[in-house]
Amino acid sequence: MTKRAMLLAILFSTFALTTQAQTITGAGASFPYPIYAKWASMYEKQTGNKVNYQSIGSGGGQQQIIAKTIDFGASDDPMKAELLAQHQLLQFPAIIGGTVPVVNLPEITAGQLKLSGEVLADIFLGKIKKWNDPAIAKLNQGANLPDKAIIVVHRSDGSGTTFGWTNYLSKVSTEWKETVGQGKSVKWPTGQGGKGNEGVAAYVSKIKYSIGYVEYAYAKQNQLAWASLQNKAGQFVQPSAESFMAAAANAQWESAVGMGVILTNEEGDTSWPVTAASFILLHKHAEKPEITKAVFDFFDWAFKQGKVAATELDYVPLPEEVIQKIQAQWKTEVKSSDGKTLWQ
């Protein structure tokens, strides 16, 4: 090969790499942010393609994908069927995890405190005001519970984590269901708000005798003590990938529009009661086909090569049969403006 030919080959390969590299943007739920950030870092190292994901809350993710200011949205609160239809959006699950109650009690270690759903609801209703309340003491006989006021911390932003939390409380407490209800944002009876899982974790970490709720990875990363919860079977369980997997084991993904299955208060002796899937949203009519294809490529890579990273962060990867259903939808439901299929 001549020097000129070698130079042309190098220039061509450099140009090819440059043109192939893609940057995609996503925003939404803070619940999956730790794993999405990890996946994005790994993906860029392996492929050169960038994924910029902003943790702004599920409400923001839904709003921005509707407004078409991002390439994909993320939400832990599955979008309602009428909105999916109105805005021609495809929704699919990407990861499974769990929300945990976290506490700042100097005498209590992770998993030591036991709470039932009813007691948890009464705490967040402001009815149980002190840590040594008889209802808590009954579940924790022999524990050194302080005679201190409980400081409740909740989310201040529109949040899929809040949706899952309030959905669970609505299932275990009639009073909660009738007075507060469920949603990405609710009128809290008591407490102070933190923005994102990050904000709630920071508040609980700093404020003694507080209680809040965060995705499990945030509890571990911030070295917060979590409570064990009594599940639907009456068993006290610890949060873990295994207990999240147990809750998701019998999920009927195709029973809900957009695969929007809710996994709170599921059956099973080992099921964690506040388990959730986190969902991805994108437009079915791809105005920028190459970008939509890049979104598919990223999540295809994550489903195949991101499982170990997900497990290390205590998330649960999707089962293979669910991935096959998702990718079948990519092929049939998402098209370019000229009707071409973007996923083969």
Curated annotation (Swiss-Prot):
One Pfam family here: PBP_like_2
Signal peptide as annotated in the record: 1-18
Molecular function GO labels: phosphate ion binding
Cellular component, GO annotation: ATP-binding cassette (ABC) transporter complex; periplasmic space
Primary location: periplasm
Gene3D superfamilies: Periplasmic binding protein-like II
Binding residue positions for phosphate: 29-31, 58, 76, 159-161
GO BP: phosphate ion transmembrane transport
SUPFAM superfamilies: Periplasmic binding protein-like II
InterPro entries for the chain: ABC_phos-bd_PstS, PBP_domain, Phosphate-bind_PstS
Swiss-Prot/TrEMBL keywords: Periplasm, Phosphate transport, Signal, Transport
Protein location: Periplasm
The family this protein is said to belong to: Belongs to the PstS family.
SUBUNIT field: The complex is composed of two ATP-binding proteins (PstB), two transmembrane proteins (PstC and PstA) and a solute-binding protein (PstS).
NCBIfam families associated with the record: 3a0107s03, PRK10918.1
Function: Part of the ABC transporter complex PstSACB involved in phosphate import.
Alphabetical list of PANTHER family matching this protein: PHOSPHATE-BINDING PROTEIN PSTS (PTHR42996:SF1)
Protein name stated in the entry: Phosphate-binding protein PstS
